[in-house]
């Protein structure tokens, strides 16, 4: 459901670009250029996997590591052929006119890379290793660098002025100077230890991922070409995106924002501003908004009437007393749980498949128009009745801790989880729920006879490899215990059901059933 920023996929695209090694049998008439070479610090005895390409077909290269010493040739063709090399020493050197070089995913077998003696390099991939140092100071032709998922504490790209894509996430960088990389269009430096990031000289940036650092501020006013920003999980207290009019995807969750002005972002499609300190959010100028994550803020109201393309709204854990989604006919997922909402009108949301509205003040809930509903969590409200006749796709139902006196699930043949504890039910029939695997139903008002009929209505699971489970009681003092123990719980056990006390994952099987009730044919 959640949108994926372009820079999330760029690492995969980069790997495809760099999977271009071709190793023909012949070396041609050319000689290896021994003045150009790349040196790796490797684990002696390890097998190193490389991919290479040259500026022309049949470019000769020589690979040396102790006793390993051979010459081969590479092409310009982008391919998927890789070369496996046995490291016979602690260094591995690749001589020749190598233009694209990829030594990624060798893990602890590569700890350092020096490409400074090969000025022809245009693309370098060395991600998912254990690099502690990387020297690209003399690689002035470099346009793409992916050194992510290593152990780098510093990275000097000041001499790589042609760089257009820099991917250096998941390292230990405390600083990053990209002031000399004015051609940069994509920067992914997330999951480092950066305390500041100056991108004022990178006016061509289109995607920026700097999340999970220690940034206290971020100035994107010079980056008017940006369409994707992810600066989440930092310490940013203010964010000005008024000049980023092309912005489509903004993820700034888990910061310290108290305000967010989106009036100049008409192209915005996905917004994640969750887990901040926002008390207001104006979305009237964002007609293309498709996904909204604004949960865990301090919102007292939320107007989404202009966001008619909205498919996902996650606004739980705020201070909302009402929520109007009558203009959001495309809505598929709504999470407004943990608020103070007293009423919820869902008649104009025919595409709704997920609804979380638990922990509110609802006294009623009409889902009769939501025929595509698959998951419903409305527990911890004050609902007195729940009509599920029209929700035939419903698979997950959580309606516990309400005031429901009867519950008809006979039309919900896809139901897998039934969570209805803490209500006022006097009967429960699941004979039509052939997919049911979990039932939490303690704390109701079922008599012993009603428990017997419930056990009889359970679908037969004796043929399944894993036991299904029902919870007629919880581990605390339960007033229903005498009625449950007087029933014949062995009926459920013979059908392959585990009958347990609910105890937050440390369930204890219920023993001591004294009933001898036998099911009638209607339940067989």
What kind of feature is each model-predicted range?
Residues 2-11, 17-120, 224, 243, ...:
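N-terminal capping/linker segments that flank leucine-rich repeat
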Residues 101-103, 124-126, 145-147, 166-168, ...:
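Conserved hydrophobic beta-strand positions in leucine-rich repeat
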Residues 101-131, 138-140, 148-149, 159:
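Right-handed parallel beta-helix
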Residues 132-133, 152-154, 173-175, 179, ...:
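Long, intrinsically disordered low-complexity tandem-repeat segments
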């Amino acid at each position: 459901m959640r949108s994926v920023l372009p820079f999330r996929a760029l690492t995969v695209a980069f790997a495809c670009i760099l999977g271009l090694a071709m190793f023909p049998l012949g070396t041609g008439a050319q000689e290896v250029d021994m003045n150009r070479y790349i040196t790796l610090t490797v684990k002696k005895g390890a097998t190193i996997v490389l991919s290479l390409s040259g500026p022309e077909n049949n470019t000769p290269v020589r690979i040396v590591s102790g006793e390993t010493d051979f010459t081969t040739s590479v092409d310009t063709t982008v391919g998927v052929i890789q070369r496996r090399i046995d490291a016979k020493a602690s260094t591995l050197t690749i001589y020749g006119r190598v233009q694209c070089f990829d030594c990624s995913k060798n893990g602890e077998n590569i700890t350092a890379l020096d490409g400074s003696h090969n000025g022809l390099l245009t693309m370098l991939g060395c991600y998912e290793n254990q690099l502690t140092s990387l020297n690209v100071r003399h690689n002035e032709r470099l346009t793409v660098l992916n050194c992510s998922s290593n152990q780098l504490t510093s990275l000097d790209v000041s001499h790589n002025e042609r760089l257009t894509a820099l991917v250096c996430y998941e390292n230990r960088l405390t600083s990053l100077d990209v002031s000399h990389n004015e051609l940069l269009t994509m920067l992914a430096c997330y999951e480092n230890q950066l305390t500041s990031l100056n991108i004022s000289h990178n006016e061509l940036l289109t995607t920026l991922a700097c999340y999970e650092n220690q940034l206290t501020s971020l100035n994107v006013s010079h980056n008017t070409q940006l369409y994707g920003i992810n600066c989440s999980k930092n310490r940013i207290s203010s964010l000005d995106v008024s000049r980023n009019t092309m912005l489509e995807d903004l993820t700034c969750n888990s910061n310290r924002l108290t305000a967010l002005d989106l009036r100049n972002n008409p192209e915005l499609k996905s917004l994640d501003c969750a887990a901040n300190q926002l008390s207001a959010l104006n979305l009237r100028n964002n007609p293309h908004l498709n996904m909204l994550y604004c949960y865990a803020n301090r919102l007292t109201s939320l107007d989404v009437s202009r966001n008619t393309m909205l498919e996902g709204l996650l606004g739980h854990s705020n201070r909302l007393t009402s929520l109007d989604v009558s203009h959001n006919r495309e809505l598929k997922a709504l999470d407004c749980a943990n608020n103070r909402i007293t009423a919820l009108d869902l008649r104009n949301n025919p595409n709704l498949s997920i609804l979380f509205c638990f922990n509110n003040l609802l006294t009623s809930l009409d889902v009769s128009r939501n025929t595509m509903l698959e998951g419903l969590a409305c527990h911890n409200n004050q609902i007195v009745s729940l009509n599920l006749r029209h929700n035939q796709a419903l698979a997950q139902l959580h309606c516990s801790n309400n005031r429901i006196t009867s519950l008809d699930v006979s039309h919900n043949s896809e139901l897998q989880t039934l969570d209805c504890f803490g209500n006022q039910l006097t009967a429960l029939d699941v004979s039509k729920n052939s997919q049911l695997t979990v039932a939490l139903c303690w704390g109701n008002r079922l008599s012993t006879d009603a428990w017997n009929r419930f056990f009889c209505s359970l679908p037969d699971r004796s043929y399944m490899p894993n036991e299904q489970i029902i919870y007629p009681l919880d581990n605390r003092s339960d007033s229903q215990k005498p009625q449950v123990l007087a029933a014949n719980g062995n009926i459920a056990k013979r059908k392959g059901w585990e009958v347990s006390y609910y105890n937050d994952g440390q369930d204890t099987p219920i023993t001591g059933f004294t009933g001898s009730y036998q099911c009638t044919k209607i339940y067989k």
